[in-house]
Amino acid sequence: MDQQPLAHPQQRPPPSLKNPRFTLELEFVSSLANPYYLSHLAVTYPNLLGISKSSDDSNTGTEGPDPEAQAFAAYLAYLYSYWKTPEYAQFLTHPGATLRALRLLQEETFRRDIIRPQVIEALAGTGLEDGQGGQNVEAGDIGHNEGDQGTQQDKENIASKT
């Protein structure tokens, strides 16, 4: 499989639907708006999200972080760094939900917690996909503010539903 998006992560692909790298990354980040896709990633590729296959009792601190998890976290940070700009966000079908998911995925604790069904259901219940789940979190904290201000509010909303 072509590893081009990881080969030069500092170079943004030109925002054109004719650019294969751009369309590949657009498809990937768009899929992150779906909490059930996040669940699929957590279950199928737990190592990429820093989820240990063994229980936390083996966490003695002697092992360093998984290099694959670090690379994937860096890739997510790279994606978030440019998809949040208006030049790229205009191509997103669900920009609020997509950018919210990318922002939450910047946090190690969130990447570990998304394997729990309660967290996924809470995300689905907040309207991550369509904004109909009660409080529309993404409208207030991503629509106009590209910072990380809404992260604590997102955590509290998710925690209150679990």
Swiss-Prot record:
Segments of skewed composition (Basic and acidic residues): 141-162
One Pfam match: Med31
Top-rank taxon, per record: Eukaryota
InterPro entries with a match to the protein in the record: Med31_sf (IPR038089), Mediator_Med31 (IPR008831)
Keyword check for Nucleus: yes
Keyword terms of this UniProt record: Activator, Nucleus, Transcription, Transcription regulation
Location of the protein in the cell: Nucleus
Transcription in keyword set: yes
GO annotation, biological process: regulation of DNA-templated transcription
Biological function: Component of the Mediator complex, a coactivator involved in the regulated transcription of nearly all RNA polymerase II-dependent genes. Mediator functions as a bridge to convey information from gene-specific regulatory proteins to the basal RNA polymerase II transcription machinery. Mediator is recruited to promoters by direct interactions with regulatory proteins and serves as a scaffold for the assembly of a functional preinitiation complex with RNA polymerase II and the general transcription factors.
Annotated spans, Disordered: 126-162
Protein's name according to its UniProt entry: Mediator of RNA polymerase II transcription subunit 31
Entry's family note: Belongs to the Mediator complex subunit 31 family.
